[in-house]
């Protein structure tokens, strides 16, 4: 029984193999024929679509307005140039419209094509109003995508890198915020022929890749969209606007400018604690800090465009410069009054000595006159001669009169101006910093509003 069963299984397997090979070949031939038929069908569809198609004419010419739906996917944003007031953005720019001439029927609902077909049909003549330079990527082939649906709806996508203008108001620099626009629209068609519409809402029509930020000095806060109509001598045109909201990072400028300025001001106030007689040391402090502030103010302006107004950093540097220069003027004032005080002290000492010498001379002159008047009678009167001798003989036990101490120059003394400056200067500078940082850091960023 076992031998008969095994023999039956072998014959069954051989029979299946003999039957399956022809069936497999037949199925493969059928699939190959279907693929060839599909290619043939698609080729015929495309040929039929382009037969009599004029890509010089827009869809719905003379009947309706062509509506172009757009959205943008940002793959890379930045860098932003402050000196040139421009930014660079890399995007997938998508446009969608309907062309009744491209309706078709076939086994597929969507035809997925490349840039070769895009050059044979009508496409919107979109350009960027504020673009300084735009590049369409062509490596290794033009980065373009075209999809045609069976109802005539087309999706046209291309990869672009755009350098666009970004108007900046730098009054609050470096605590400033900006709204960089990207404006685009039709170059030739007015609003009565072609109009643009955002495909989705504000958050979905312009999307930024999670790793798309290429900003070192800014934070990308978000984006908004808008639409406006501009008038020119050739008609009215639709302009689509996407705003990218930026907030500057202050850390770099704190390290490079603010901290050095603060330390320079503090260093200039160290001279208040030096002796007023230390002229070389205090002069070095004053001149060095003034030159340092000059260098800092020049270097801070190098990274900015040459604007005609003062920025927040300019005001800070100007006030710091005023404090440093005031410290130098304070030393000059202290030095002037110190030397003037010494001069008055010396003059008073000289006057006292002159007065004392004058009184001695007056006494000697009076005595000489008395002697001269009574000299002829001294020999006649023995009493007068005795008195005159006793008058000329000094008294040995007479104590000298107490004379006022001579004024002396006082060294290592502290000026009243220095004492006041030690308190007034730090208090004023601290108050200025408190008001300055509280004003600018708590201020809400002023961003451009989309029309």
UniProtKB/Swiss-Prot annotation:
It catalyses: chloride(in) = chloride(out). InterPro entries: GABAA/Glycine_rcpt, GABAAa_rcpt, GABBAa2_rcpt, Gabra-1-6_TM, Gabra-2_ECD, Neur_chan_lig-bd, Neur_chan_lig-bd_sf, Neur_channel. One of its GO terms (cellular component) is postsynaptic specialization membrane. Glycans are attached at residues 38, 138. The chain crosses the membrane at residues 250-270, 281-300, 312-332, 421-441. Keywords: Cell membrane, Cell projection, Chloride, Chloride channel, Cytoplasmic vesicle, Disulfide bond, Glycoprotein, Ion channel, Ion transport, Ligand-gated ion channel, Membrane, Postsynaptic cell membrane, Receptor, Signal, Synapse, Transmembrane, Transmembrane helix, Transport. Activated by pentobarbital. Inhibited by the antagonist bicuculline. It is found in: Postsynaptic cell membrane; Cell membrane; Cytoplasmic vesicle membrane; Cell projection, Dendrite. The keyword Hydrolase does not apply. The keyword DNA-binding does not apply. PROSITE patterns: NEUROTR_ION_CHANNEL. Belongs to the ligand-gated ion channel (TC 1.A.9) family. Gamma-aminobutyric acid receptor (TC 1.A.9.5) subfamily. GABRA2 sub-subfamily. This is Gamma-aminobutyric acid receptor subunit alpha-2. It comes from Mus musculus (Mouse).
